[in-house]
Amino acid sequence: MDPFTEKLLERTRARRENLQRKMAERPTAAPRSMTHAKRARQPLSEASNQQPLSGGEEKSCTKPSPSKKRCSDNTEVEVSNLENKQPVESTSAKSCSPSPVSPQVQPQAADTISDSVAVPASLLGMRRGLNSRLEATAASSVKTRMQKLAEQRRRWDNDDMTDDIPESSLFSPMPSEEKAASPPRPLLSNASATPVGRRGRLANLAATICSWEDDVNHSFAKQNSVQEQPGTACLSKFSSASGASARINSSSVKQEATFCSQRDGDASLNKALSSSADDASLVNASISSSVKATSPVKSTTSITDAKSCEGQNPELLPKTPISPLKTGVSKPIVKSTLSQTVPSKGELSREICLQSQSKDKSTTPGGTGIKPFLERFGERCQEHSKESPARSTPHRTPIITPNTKAIQERLFKQDTSSSTTHLAQQLKQERQKELACLRGRFDKGNIWSAEKGGNSKSKQLETKQETHCQSTPLKKHQGVSKTQSLPVTEKVTENQIPAKNSSTEPKGFTECEMTKSSPLKITLFLEEDKSLKVTSDPKVEQKIEVIREIEMSVDDDDINSSKVINDLFSDVLEEGELDMEKSQEEMDQALAESSEEQEDALNISSMSLLAPLAQTVGVVSPESLVSTPRLELKDTSRSDESPKPGKFQRTRVPRAESGDSLGSEDRDLLYSIDAYRSQRFKETERPSIKQVIVRKEDVTSKLDEKNNAFPCQVNIKQKMQELNNEINMQQTVIYQASQALNCCVDEEHGKGSLEEAEAERLLLIATGKRTLLIDELNKLKNEGPQRKNKASPQSEFMPSKGSVTLSEIRLPLKADFVCSTVQKPDAANYYYLIILKAGAENMVATPLASTSNSLNGDALTFTTTFTLQDVSNDFEINIEVYSLVQKKDPSGLDKKKKTSKSKAITPKRLLTSITTKSNIHSSVMASPGGLSAVRTSNFALVGSYTLSLSSVGNTKFVLDKVPFLSSLEGHIYLKIKCQVNSSVEERGFLTIFEDVSGFGAWHRRWCVLSGNCISYWTYPDDEKRKNPIGRINLANCTSRQIEPANREFCARRNTFELITVRPQREDDRETLVSQCRDTLCVTKNWLSADTKEERDLWMQKLNQVLVDIRLWQPDACYKPIGKP
């Protein structure tokens, strides 16, 4: 344990003993009521809302008074005060214990209202008693102020009393810490036989205060935020006290918010009174909205009174927002008192918050993880309650008595002589104002300010500050768990400044801070302090457990709290939207979208708080709010500094967002390193474009994949099915062509005509294709899909695929035949047909060419262009030449005339003749066309040739199988072009060895492998702007395979050797890199890569290019030299 903690523990023990001793010496009920009155004086002196503050101050002062005396000036003292709070917590625990009773009272229909009213009534009565006592002990001005405040309250009650009274009564116990304690007070007051008349008065006042809910929703939210901030960062003691009270009850958060805002106006009580009415409505309104949205969440998060109230009585949550309003009025009084004694009050408030939290947690059903710690406080509280049972009504009065006196004296002294302190605080306040203005300068156009008129300035600043404060508390909360004492000090200073400064802007700032720090944050901090107080050894463990418990409870309670928040928030939205409903919804949606990323990473506390709110507004689902704590903290800081309102603020005060806030995402200002880092982290989260470095790419795998893709493993069954379908189609074509030919019985019916020749052509093509398909099918059945992979290349590199194109086909005829056909054109018709076959799937037939129309000189020309795609280098294309002779019978016409004269042709005779002749022409033998084929084609094969890669470069090919008496000359002319589908490319720096004036030098070059050449430049940018310095043509390479250079000759690492040959020139001479042999100049190229991997990659790609060149363009390159 560090020495600082040990000091705190020692001081805590001493204070505890002192407090217990003083408590034993104190009177019971009467002095406690006096204490309450004194506390009420303090808030009255500072704030206009005295009555609510009395209750809240009683709670706050209960713990802090002893601790404040000791630790009013020290932040450490506050931590110790938290420990000292245990005795105070006993009282506050009592108050919390009554809060469970308050749920019991609430079930009673009339009693709920009366009790809730009784709470303010008891507070009012106590305040009145306190007023009289204050007159005795303090300046009469305080009493006068309290009376004025009470009168003003009555006026508000008379003006604002509405149907909200029952709600207020219901809310009162839950929302404010004072109210949380107040419901127990009514019970206690009942137990103590509190007069009915007094109850009635208090009920009326409570109803009036509750009726303010509609007007005070936004201000109430602000108060909530104020409490949250002190709870989180413990920056201001007021806020810490209010935060603690907020822990006890979400209403207490409201009270603290009001308290903080009023504390700012403490310097001028009258002004504060007048402004408190307006602020009460505005601040309470914001508080109510924030508490509505926040307080349930806070109660859930902190697992304090709000949570316990939810578990005990679900009505308490709705009540919470209203009671915070009431308590918010009373809190200003406490704020005033605390502002006078800022350090002591901050400590007191913080201690109270901690105690109340512990009490609430002990009573809270959801605080299971914190239970052992809470049980300890509960036991102590029970002991104190046994010692002073009369405390029930005044609760904290006895504890406050000794400390309260000192605090009151300090407050009066501060009122009388606040020159030095006041000036210092004013300076601080001015600085805070400047910061608030800077942080919220984009929110100047808030709808809040426009609506509230006179308070527009204060409201704008408040909203601005709320926006910033929401972020700052989160940031502060980050460091709260680590250094609790420091946040406490910050809070105290901040709260002191606003307390002394009567301007509403500091109020808004403090409120904003409290609001921002969300109850969960406060709870975490307070619980940590409590754990420190309770035990020194298990302190760290308890901290962790408490935090975990809180998080779990927040998640569990989000459902219940979200429901309540939705109900409460609906009213706020109705009030806030009015004419701006549509614009606000659009703004909220736009803001939600723009800030969704930022708000996703809110603190755990803010997550729990915002989840229900997000559900209400429909911004983001609670699940989306979950994120790691680091991200939450970072994003929180960024969102805090951004001018646009956060989710929390937006939901509470939807109207407070200006139109400019829509584009606020673009103007996010990064005030801190955290914000910058979070932004940078967000950027890294986005999917970045991965830059592929070619030199590190494994080309072998790609090449293998590419090569294996062509002999793809097609499903055998599917392939066989396709072949069968194609065979059936060809069978149909064969049958139809045969039937057509059978009809050509004479010249009148197409015999010897072009149609008959076309039918013969179709029959020939279909028959040949069917035969090829059957052969392919049989191969598939016998050999399977591995047939194509049998001829695997011997070398390591697979040659690339290519395309083959055949064009300009010419078929020369014999000169004698050409002359005879010209002389006797009517003797016969000669038709020629060329079929190109490259497997069963690639079969193309040229159109019919006859000597009458296609003869060009002594050769027949065919315009067909045949192209094969994606063929390997071992392709084979079969060329087959067919001819058909249609001889004309000169006596045919005479015979036809005779028959027509002798016998008329009737349909019956025609049918008989066709049948007879078709039977004559039909073939009895099995036809290649299939079983259903009637006949075979009359085309005869007169020549054939097989083309391969070796045929490339030739245009004249000798036909095989040419008959001796054929009309063909025996040759065929065609153009064959092969194109390699090689896309091997590489770019990178290589160091090339060159001869410079007889000396070897290595020069770094930017080399590009494209096509068959390696081109190199000095810089990469020169590739597109300049001609290359030099080229190495791989077609001239004589190296059988490119390999690493021999280290005996080249000592440079990662070097490979490339030997090229070119014809010798006259000016060639031998150098270090080139030698002349016979008529050739041999150049040895050494290229060095930066790494071994790069060298291997270059070698692989160069070898691939060489393979493709040598296989596809054998005549275009030199034959390799060396061992095969």
Swiss-Prot record:
Q: According to the UniProt record, list the residues that bear Phosphotyrosine.
A: Y671
Q: Which residues form the signal peptide?
A: none
PH domain span: 983-1107
* Residue ranges the record marks as coiled coil: 569-604
Any one GO MF term held by the record is:
cadherin binding
- Low complexity composition bias: residue spans: 97-108
Subunit architecture: Interacts with F-actin. Interacts with CD2AP. May interact with RHOA. Interacts with FZR1/CDH1 during mitotic exit.
Annotated disorder: Focal segmental glomerulosclerosis 8: A renal pathology defined by the presence of segmental sclerosis in glomeruli and resulting in proteinuria, reduced glomerular filtration rate and progressive decline in renal function. Renal insufficiency often progresses to end-stage renal disease, a highly morbid state requiring either dialysis therapy or kidney transplantation.
The name of this protein is Anillin
Q: Give the organism the record lists.
A: Homo sapiens (Human)
Lineage of producing organism: Eukaryota, Metazoa, Chordata, Craniata, Vertebrata
